[in-house]
Regions:
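Cap/insert and terminal regions of metallo-dependent hydrolase folds
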Residues: 2-15, 116, 121, 146-155, ...
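Active-site metal-binding motif and surrounding structural segment of the metallo-beta-lactamase
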Residues: 100-148, 236-242
Length: 360
């Protein structure tokens, strides 16, 4: 770790000063938590529908060579050019160090982990409990898969029983080969922290996975920063981006993106090309922020349509091919508390390269 340019004075750091929380946020958050209507809107009012993948979904290879299945939160199975990569798998009931306290899952996992066919690699973005789940990792050990993680996280995996030879740790801008795929750790603007361990002792990252014909980007958790354009210039364009658009707040603007910032990141990564699909992640599964439960996806779809960007918003567990036309069905509206003035209409805009501009 000491060799990393990100490791300074005994800690991993972002290139620019990054606030985990703005001054005075604790008191303001307490007031927000006391709002009855706010509490109601932060959770669904009905049972979240989930698609259980079947052989009909996964039985044949994707025609385009790329298929994504959002399992909820930031967990995504990417089938890319004949390989299977599982990002940030969290199958646990809570994202917490405790089984009896902490944010609880709002919908069941689409598929039991034991029913998931083996994957070629598990990729972890950082060590927070909603991205690195110990019971899930322990279950995946039995499959013989390889774990590709940022610097420092390998120690946790070894402690949990993952053989050292199946762990690959990477710094930003370093790559590893998995079959015909190249996995590259890329920058993110976030932080780490787990249990009672000292601060910033593991790195956080976004990820690029490139195959012979397709390439994807997974943001992990991050604030909006100029690095997206640099990643796009070096590794893009992408056939799909998986972008964090939930758990944002005015109380921590540096470490989580709003939906509109998520779209800006997608535009930067795409270098002005509207062809790649945006899959919103980090929403819907756990209640982690003061915003309404459905706001992240509502705002993302609205912003994407206005910009002429291709966006997918599938049910948890519903596979899709980013190359296909994406027809968004607002399934979440059936289980969310409607806004005071009703559900808004989305802009009906046809995607075009002219409408989709890189935001600087």
């Amino acid at each position: 770790m000491q060799r990393s340019p990100q490791f300074v004075d005994g800690q991993f750091r972002n290139p620019v000063p990054t606030r985990q929380m703005v001054p005075g946020a604790a008191l303001a958050m307490a007031r927000t938590q006391l709002s009855r209507e706010g509490r109601l809107r932060r959770s669904p009012v009905g049972r979240i529908p989930v698609h259980r993948p079947t052989a009909a979904d996964w039985g044949e290879p994707p025609a385009s060579g790329l298929r994504l299945t959002w399992m909820g939160h930031s967990s995504v199975l990417a089938e890319i050019d004949g390989h299977r990569v599982l990002f940030d798998p969290v199958w646990g009931e809570r994202c917490s160090p405790f089984t009896w306290a902490g944010p609880r899952r709002l919908h069941p996992v689409p598929l039991a982990l034991g029913e998931l066919d083996p994957v070629d690699a598990v990729v972890i973005s950082h060590d927070h409990y909603d991205h690195l789940d110990m019971p899930t990792v322990k279950a995946l050990i039995r499959t013989g898969t390889r774990f590709v993680v940022p610097l420092g996280i390998g120690a946790d995996l070894e402690l949990w029983g993952v053989p050292a030879e199946r762990i690959t740790e990477l710094d930003w801008h370093e790559s590893a080969a998995v079959g015909e795929l190249t996995l590259t750790a890329t920058p993110a603007q976030h932080f780490c922290g787990r249990g009672l361990r000292g601060p910033q002792h593991t790195l956080w990252a976004s990820w690029v996975v490139a195959g012979p014909a397709n390439r994807v980007f997974h943001s992990g958790d991050t604030g909006y920063f100029p690095g997206f354009a640099e990643i796009g210039a070096e590794h893009g364009p992408f056939d799909a981006t998986m972008i964090q658009i939930g758990a944002y707040s005015e109380f921590w603007p540096d470490i989580h993106m709003t939906p509109e910032e998520g779209l800006r990141a997608h535009a930067d990564l795409s270098q002005g090309s509207p062809a790649g699909a945006l899959l919103p992640i980090h929403w819907g599964t756990f209640n982690l922020a003061p915003h309404a439960w459905s706001d992240p996806v509502e705002r993302t779809v609205a912003a994407a349509r206005e910009a002429g960007a291709k966006v997918a918003a599938p049910l948890p567990g519903k596979p899709f091919e980013p190359a296909d036309e994406q027809i968004v069905d607002p399934w979440w509206r059936s289980v969310a508390l409607p806004p005071t003035h009703g559900w808004p209409s989305w802009p009906a805009v046809t995607p075009s390269a002219d409408a989709f501009e890189v935001v600087r």
